[in-house]
């Protein structure tokens, strides 16, 4: 089983207790617990549908998520009728923030509150028709006849979903909808995530074709988008093996890059959008 695709995919969903006597992991969409002292393996039930691992080409439509409380506990943000709403906890009064969400261009249920509880961020998503490939299982274990399977899989030239990170101020209702020229040829947009000072959000842009990858910052004050990092390649930017860690002060971040032909870590200055220094070096 160790060499199977399923096991490799789920290996990251593994945890060990502080006493090092209990191991929990996910395999084939089931939760398992191994107690080493009893040498006992227990099935703890199925993984909820929302948390199940998907094929890497399956698109998350981001339509379903729990309401999100603000850090100060005074508000709850949620999606209703494809738009962003907030509810005041003390009074139960609802307020609609976005007005332009539709079935064909809706707001993501993955809402992020600013640390100061004054703003929310979410992506506006333009979905596309899902594409599939089909394959035949010639000798299924549970029946004599072959089985036809289908797998969601976008092929070269197929249209892809388009995401626009947006910010809304709770009290004023002001919207910050950015220009998209720095992320207009999307394979994927990841984020947004709030900066510690609540003045901007950060998101990542993976350009279709994988020759450009950017870390971008959207100002909650001006609505302008600026690049913090840009990786380019004539062949391929390895987006599956990158790493970013934002430092708590909001002024620096650690970034992994292959720009010197080796995969190394850099300390980036978020203010200047330039590397302060290279953390690791060498032909390794």
Enumerate the language-model features and the residues they cover.
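Beta-propeller folds
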Residues: 4-284
């Amino acid at each position: 089983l160790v060499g199977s695709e399923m096991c490799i995919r789920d290996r990251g969903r593994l945890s060990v207790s502080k006493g090092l006597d209990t191991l929990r992991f996910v395999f084939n969409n089931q939760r398992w617990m191994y107690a080493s002292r009893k040498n006992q393996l227990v099935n703890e039930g199925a993984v909820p549908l929302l948390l199940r691992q998907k094929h890497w080409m399956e698109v998350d439509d981001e339509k379903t998520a729990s309401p999100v409380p603000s850090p100060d506990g005074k508000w709850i943000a949620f999606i209703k009728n494809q738009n962003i709403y907030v509810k005041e906890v003390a009074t139960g009064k609802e307020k609609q923030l976005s007005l332009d969400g539709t079935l064909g261009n809706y707001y993501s249920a993955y809402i992020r509150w600013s640390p100061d509880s004054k703003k929310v961020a979410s992506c506006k998503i333009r979905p596309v028709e899902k594409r599939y490939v089909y394959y035949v299982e010639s000798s299924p274990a549970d029946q004599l006849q072959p089985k036809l399977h289908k797998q969601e899989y976008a092929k070269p030239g197929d249209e892809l979903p388009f995401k626009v990170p947006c910010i809304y101020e709770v009290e004023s209702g002001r919207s910050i909808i950015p220009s998209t020229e720095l992320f207009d040829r999307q394979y994927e947009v990841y984020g947004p995530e709030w900066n510690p000072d609540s003045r901007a959000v950060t998101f990542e842009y993976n350009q279709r074709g994988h020759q450009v990858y950017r870390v971008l910052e959207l100002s909650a004050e001006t609505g302008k988008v600026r690049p913090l990092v840009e990786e380019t390649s004539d062949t391929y930017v390895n987006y599956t093996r990158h790493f970013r860690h934002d430092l708590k002060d909001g002024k620096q971040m650690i970034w992994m890059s292959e720009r010197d032909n080796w995969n190394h870590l850099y300390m980036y200055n978020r203010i200047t959008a330039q590397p302060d220094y290279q953390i690791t070096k060498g032909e390794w």
